């Protein structure tokens, strides 16, 4: 069963790679890669997979390819 997860992304961050959970449970992912040629999206997918303990192949970007607010399907 697939699950959808929404995250906020901070590309080009000096803090990254880091995952923070807010008080409301929302995840913010900090990555060092800049949002150029999909590099930040690749880094976010890798970081999310590590954080959730699932293979990268099970994570699919559903929406937000050019936005800081992204939705992923975990399958």
From Swiss-Prot:
InterPro entries: DUF167, YggU-like_sf. Belongs to the UPF0235 family. This is UPF0235 protein Mflv_3569. It comes from Mycolicibacterium gilvum (strain PYR-GCK). It holds the Pfam family DUF167. One of its GO terms (cellular component) is cytoplasm. The lineage of its organism: Bacteria, Bacillati, Actinomycetota, Actinomycetes, Mycobacteriales.
């Amino acid at each position: 069963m697939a699950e959808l997860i929404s995250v906020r992304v901070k590309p080009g961050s000096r803090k990254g790679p880091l995952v923070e959970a807010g008080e409301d449970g929302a995840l913010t992912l900090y990555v060092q890669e800049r949002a150029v040629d999909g590099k930040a999206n690749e880094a976010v997918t890798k970081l999310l997979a590590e954080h959730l303990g699932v293979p990268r192949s099970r994570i699919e970007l559903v929406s937000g390819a050019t936005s800081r607010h992204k939705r992923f399907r975990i399958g």
